[in-house]
């Protein structure tokens, strides 16, 4: 059977429970049509690049699916009908990615980065105006300004 990665975006005002119900509904459709969902990832609420249907944020969900194309067509039909789904995308792939997706790895990396103890960096010199840098010795003296060219401009 063909392999698919399917991502859908649910409205930001939908609760996490509603998003999980949508996910189980999609999983049920796939399994009912002879396929299986090998991985489900909820990426949480993320900001959108631009407004879609008056939404600036959305719940992102990834499904890795091993199913016939009829199952994907039915999922997409149900998502078109659903008012909670803003957008969806199904991509046929040669093989499904094992382990966490790139988005989940990025989220883990960001969490680790937060634990590094950023924040206050101590007292710092300077900041703002740094003063005159002095004469640049590598330059020769300045050329005299041509009075004629200044008058013409």
Curated annotation (Swiss-Prot):
GO terms for biological process: translation. Gene3D superfamilies: 3.30.70.60. GO terms for molecular function: small ribosomal subunit rRNA binding; structural constituent of ribosome. Keywords: Ribonucleoprotein, Ribosomal protein, RNA-binding, rRNA-binding. One of its GO terms (cellular component) is cytosolic small ribosomal subunit. Residues 97-153 are annotated as: Disordered. InterPro entries: Ribosomal_bS6, Ribosomal_bS6_sf, Ribosomal_S6_plastid/chlpt, Transl_elong_EF1B/ribsomal_bS6. Residues 105-147 have a biased composition (Basic and acidic residues). The keyword Phosphoprotein does not apply. Pfam families: Ribosomal_S6 (PF01250). Belongs to the bacterial ribosomal protein bS6 family. Binds together with bS18 to 16S ribosomal RNA. This is Small ribosomal subunit protein bS6. It comes from Bradyrhizobium sp. (strain ORS 278).
């Amino acid at each position: 059977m063909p392999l698919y990665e399917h991502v859908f975006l649910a409205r930001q005002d939908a609760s996490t429970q509603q998003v999980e119900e949508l996910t189980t509904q999609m999983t049920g459709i796939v399994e009912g049509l002879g396929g299986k969902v090998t991985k489900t990832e909820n990426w949480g609420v993320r900001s959108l690049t631009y407004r879609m249907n008056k939404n600036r944020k959305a719940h992102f969900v990834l499904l890795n699916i091993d199913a016939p194309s009829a199952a994907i067509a039915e999922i997409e039909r149900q998502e078109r009908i659903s008012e909670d789904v803003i957008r969806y995308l199904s991509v046929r792939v040669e093989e499904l990615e094992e382990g966490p997706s790139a988005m989940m790895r990025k989220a883990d990396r960001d969490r680790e980065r937060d634990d590094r103890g950023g924040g206050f960096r101590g007292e710092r010199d300077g900041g703002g105006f740094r003063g005159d840098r002095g004469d640049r010795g590598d330059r020769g003296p300045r050329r005299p300004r041509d009075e004629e060219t200044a008058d013409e401009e």
